[in-house]
Design a protein with these regions (language model features):
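Structural signal for hydrophobic packing residues in well-ordered secondary-structure cores
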Residues: 58, 62-66, 113-117, 142-149
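Internal helix-loop-helix
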Residues: 107-110, 123
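Gly/Ser/Thr-rich active-site cleft segment
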Residues: 9-11, 22, 121-155
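Internal, well-ordered alpha-helical segments in soluble enzyme and binding-protein domains
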Residues: 105-108, 117, 134-137
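Hydrophobic or amphipathic alpha-helical targeting/insertion segments
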Residues: 89-93, 111, 115-116, 120
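Carbohydrate-associated surface elements
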Residues: 102
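Generic structural signal for well-ordered, non-membrane alpha-helical segments
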Residues: 47-54, 105, 131-134, 155
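N-terminal glycine/serine-rich phosphate-binding loop of ATP-dependent small-molecule kinases
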Residues: 1-95, 123, 151
Length: 155
C-alpha cells in the first residue's frame, strides 16, 4: 500500500499525519515550540524549532506506524505565511523569524506607502503596506539591525 505524509508547520506547533491511500489516518504526532515576544507587539520564532519539530514528528509517525519509508509516496507541507527567515551565504539562519502576527513595522509601512504611493502599492501588490507582511519586515531589519541586513543573502 502507498502512504502520504501531511505536515502543518503552525504558529504553536508542528502537526504531522501519515495517511494511507484511502485517506485513513495511520499515525499522527505533534510538537509544540515557543513564541518569543521580546517587546510588546513583537512575535518571533526560531526556524530551527520548526525544522526540528518536523524531523521529530516525521520520525515518530513512521516509527509508530511501522510503515516502510519506501512506501511513503508523497509529502505535503503547509506553513505560516509572511514569516521573515533571513539566511546568510552558507544558508544559516541569521536571526529569529519575525512572524505573521508581529506588529513592529508600522514606520516601515508608512515609508513604503510614502515612497511608492498607496494606489501604486495596491496596483503592484494587490495589498496596502501591512505590518504582517514580509517586505516591511525586511525594511525593519535594514533600519534597525544593519549588521543582520548586511549578512542576508537569502530570504
Amino acid at each position: 500500500m502507498n502512504y502520504l505524509i501531511g505536515i502543518d508547520l503552525g504558529t504553536s506547533s508542528t502537526k504531522t499525519v501519515l495517511f494511507d491511500e484511502k485517506g485513513e489516518v495511520i499515525a499522527s504526532a505533534s510538537k509544540d515550540y515557543p513564541l518569543y515576544t521580546p517587546h510588546n507587539g513583537w512575535a518571533e520564532q526560531k526556524p530551527e524549532d520548526w525544522r526540528d519539530a518536523a524531523l521529530e514528528t516525521i520520525t515518530k509517525v513512521v516509527k509508530d506506524s511501522g510503515v516502510a519509508a519506501d512506501d511513503i509516496k508523497g509529502l505535503g507541507i503547509s506553513g505560516q505565511m509572511h514569516g521573515l527567515v533571513m539566511l546568510d551565504e552558507q544558508g544559516e539562519v541569521i536571526r529569529p523569524s519575525i512572524i505573521w502576527c508581529d506588529q513592529r513595522t508600522e514606520k516601515e509601512c508608512e515609508e513604503m506607502t510614502e515612497k511608492v504611493g498607496a494606489e501604486k502599492l495596491i496596483e503592484i501588490t494587490a495589498n496596502p503596506a501591512m505590518t504582517g507582511f514580509t517586505a516591511s519586515k525586511i525594511l525593519w531589519v535594514r533600519n534597525n539591525e544593519p549588521e543582520n541586513y548586511a549578512k542576508c543573502k537569502h530570504i
